[in-house]
């Protein structure tokens, strides 16, 4: 894995931050630029083209004065290129540092020899202006790459520097870095949560958008988890620290983003190999250019200028920047939305996905039972819910909890139940407000000698659609049927539609019975369903799609679906929350929002598109520039590039690549408009 310094060819900057590197490059550029002005004025160009007539100071010859002024440029400003070239050669490789060092050294050394031999045609200005332009390009390039890394910087700034810890009953403000697991934290309204913690006392709403991308505040109560870096909005919380330092979710997110940004995409590996050979071509091409012009009868000074221009303009800097800059922006874009790409290959693979296989429970659905249909006979819905909830409030069964939640959601008045009787496998009975209420399945009704009458057909139809049917009877008379199922997530339908609009096939994979799976699939618009699949067989189903020539992504919870996630071309773990380090996933979605799958693929495609644009520009630029630089158009058209112009062109090309990648920041993936499936009420 290469660091950003290595990606840019600046191993000598390895101990510096990106900002410090940019400042260092700026200082070197300013020295080179300021001194290059008088060097240019007292050069042949200044005398003959600019008609500058002032004599050199102290009675010195023009070339001697230029030599003196060039020493700081070569010794300080340009030293970074010589140092980088030595490092590259020691590593037995060739990079842009080698090319720039050769070009600067060749022109400057030739000029020094001419000066020491009594004077003649020199071009110190070519070496110093070349140095200045390359440094300018790198300075601007680093600033652009620094902008690409804004996402990581923003994440690092989320953690507050101080935390309030309660010790021996007293509130103590300590640096966040000193908080220990188990410490009792006091989190006031408006304050940031310093580390991952669990609420011990108090209720509040917490804004987790800066970490997870979740736009709405999340209600927190005792026992709920808090993410370090999130913002407590309205209530005072006391919480126990659960993870600190590098173990926090925020630290893990930053680590994943940084690892992804410094990893190589498959396309980048090809670009790196091409860059190596391009350097070799430049060195050989420069040598052949020198020899060719000498054989053509030109002077050595003219021939070496052409050779230096070829070496400079062939510099593969743009080729080396083409993919890593786009990767940095793409991963940062995902991180802001709670989408974590594990590596550069994951971005490229996401862009090529043709079919998305989604686990049903917990991915497309909420993963918990919910009353999705209510059919009443002879009694208002509010009364039915009030009576049923009164009976089920004392039960711990998941179906009972679903009925209580539906009653609370409808804001019905709470009633008390007495003589509660739980009948395992059947349901429950109780007395509520003078009525005998039975809530359970058909077997409970038969046990209590309650005839379903007209509700029998409706109950069978609901069961055939895969719902669990609960009957409510009051005083021996059935008054309602409740269809309970695992309801789709609010954004599940629009998530499927978004994927289909991207031209991607969506497949539901589940261990549930086919009737239940097909009902959910119909609601969401999914055309292909793989039902009644054992967990151990899910990976095999993914392999079948791959054998059919499809690039498949698997979306699951990262635990039960681990083998399938590993088998897929892209494994996407959804709903990771604070557990972002899921080993089998290539992409981690912090939120439990299936729409983020479409967003991740959109980001992947946009990033790959930028990578291809940048590579196309870098290759095309060299294909056009090298013949011009070699001077083959000079005899007929008089078209000549000087090394300084070549340096400006090369730097501009690199900057264009970096800026093009930064345009990714303007990408606005479609936002979902939740279309929750409302519970049906029929009377």
What is the role of each PLM region?
Residues 18-162, 273, 277-281, 302, ...:
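Transmembrane helix-loop-helix hairpins at the membrane interface
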Residues 126-189, 220, 269-270, 340-341, ...:
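Juxtamembrane coupling segments of multi-pass membrane pumps/enzymes
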Residues 1-62, 75, 154, 169-173, ...:
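Flexible metal-binding regulatory segments at protein termini and peripheral loops
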Residues 161, 211, 270, 305, ...:
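Conserved catalytic phosphorylation-site environment of P-type ATPases
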Residues 154-247, 344-388, 431:
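Conserved cytosolic catalytic loops of P-type ATPases
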Residues 31, 41, 48-64, 90, ...:
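Membrane-embedded alpha-helical bundles of multi-pass transporters
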Residues 189, 243, 263, 341, ...:
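Conserved ATP-binding TGD loop and adjacent catalytic N/P-domain core of P-type ATPases
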Residues 25-27, 230, 354-396, 426-507, ...:
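ATP-driven catalytic headpiece of P-type ATPases
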